[in-house]
Amino acid sequence: MIISVFTEKYKSIQRKLINSAVVESNGNTVQAIAQWDTGATGTCISKKIVSQLGLQPTGMIRVQTPSGIGIMNKYMINLILNNEVRIMNLVVMDSKIGNQGIDVLIGMDIISIGDFAVSNFEGRTQFSFRIPSQGHVEYHR
């Protein structure tokens, strides 16, 4: 079994979990900034990424966001996180997330295929992600 893992470390407490990513499609790649969001059920990409890769929709999907219900385009991509974790044939939707300065919003569709842990020990945030899941994380006194 191949285990893919990375840990992102910050020098201070972070309220946004950000890391580098590469979006691939049809042999083309784009460097991207990804933000992790446990409140998002699905992964989204910015309209800028759609344009840069010349992506064509594979269909439409009805989604509910904090700002309402909408219909969005679906796309098929490969996603590489921190040059370590590769997720192939990922169905994503486009979104206006580029307004937030990010290119990819990582949702629970990705988080749920592995183990995801966040720590803020000694005033420094770090988070780790690995696939496939290797076990539960439990905290004890």
Regions found by a protein language model. Give the residues of each.
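Pepsin/retropepsin-fold aspartyl endopeptidases
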Residues: M1-R141
